[in-house]
Amino acid sequence: RAPEAHLLHPDLEEVPKPVSVAGGTAGSTAHLAWLDGGGAPFDDVAIVISELGVADEVNRPLWVHLELPPDAPDLDLLAGRVTDSDGQVLSTFEVAAAPQAGQYGAFYHLTFPLRAGSYSIDIVGAAASEPQVKRSLTAEVSTVPDQGTWLSPVWLGTGVTPTPEARHGTAFTIGGWHLAPVSGPELTRTAEIVYFGFVVRPALAEEGTVELLSRVHVKRDGMSLGRPFEVPLDTAHISGDLHMYGNSIGLSGIPEIGPYDFVFEVIDTNSGASAERSVSIEITE
């Protein structure tokens, strides 16, 4: 194989980096320079959530949720880079931003299909060629366990949008349903919380069916409010040994406004495998 120097176009001075995100292009020098400049107006108020998602029975891409307050302009560009644990830049990206309505303001999702390992990710969002927000985060990427029944994290949202054309593994998208994640504690009594997730290699019943059960515990001041809400969950087959579920709970039945803790538990009844997510919510009128 020829050395890298012999593969370069005469006008290039270095080997181009791979693209970090699907649908994007390599980050331009000008846009990547924003990452090393001064602060941006919404750095201190942006909400950033990063979690490992699920693409198939093996791979867990990094999902990033970036949400800005209502007074922020809609972003038109997201750019950034991915570096490894040694500080070497592995890939860069820039992609047109697609704002969507979130719990507090517009949100943006990015999907990073990374191999198992440790990474740092730097992201900048811009509007009209002006940086509006910058954020750096670290991630430890792993794969799905290769044996036994495994349940993904339970993802909580304020709503979902059908996106049947979405690729498997797209950020916060479960079986063609795109979540607007719960990004803060305030919700009204007219709101609902949706909860979605995946199960890999479920233990099938005699009829060959997947049997999942959800329990939603509601607590106030550390005390449970009655018995948990317990319902069987419908599932849908995605591919191979990968299945998904989704459900929701309305908040109109909560007795009064104030702070509550919700615990969402999902159980594969045939194997006993389970996953759980807790969230603190301040319910308002």
Give, region by region, the residue ranges found by the protein language model.
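Intrinsically disordered, low-complexity terminal regions enriched in Ser/Thr/Pro/Gly
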Residues: 2-285
